[in-house]
Amino acid sequence: MKKVILSIFTLMAFGIMPLSAQAYTYKVVTSVESIVPNGLGRSRLISANDKRNYKDFTSTQSSVQKGRNKSKRSDLRVKGFDETKLLNFYNLGGIRFQNIATNDALITSKINAMISEGWDLAFVTSAVESDAGKGDGKGIFITRYIFKKLNN
């Protein structure tokens, strides 16, 4: 009987022990697709190669501490990045579905390459800044693909 109780207690203890947290590395790939009429905009798939630590460029504000962030833009700027040309949604004839299909093929190629390198597509988020009315004619469709990889 003692062995049965001890076995049950041991199994329960192992069942409720917390598992060690898994640590991941994240990478963001951004597509910027122009929705400017007449094909005048620029569309790109961007992936940073350089790393930055946000803490190096962060200041804390409070009622006691009123310092401001004096980081230089040149220190923040990432110069090492991959830039893949995408096609604009519009050309002189209006919306161009072939361009959208082309962009889909290029973005799919990037996603497949990342997955083959061991990354998992964790999140996708999109936003649009569109034409604000007569005379504006500007806009972008931006999508962020957030990948994660288990640290070894």
Describe the predicted segments one by one:
Residues V4-F14:
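Sec-dependent N-terminal signal peptides
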Residues V4, P18-N152:
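Terminus-proximal functional modules
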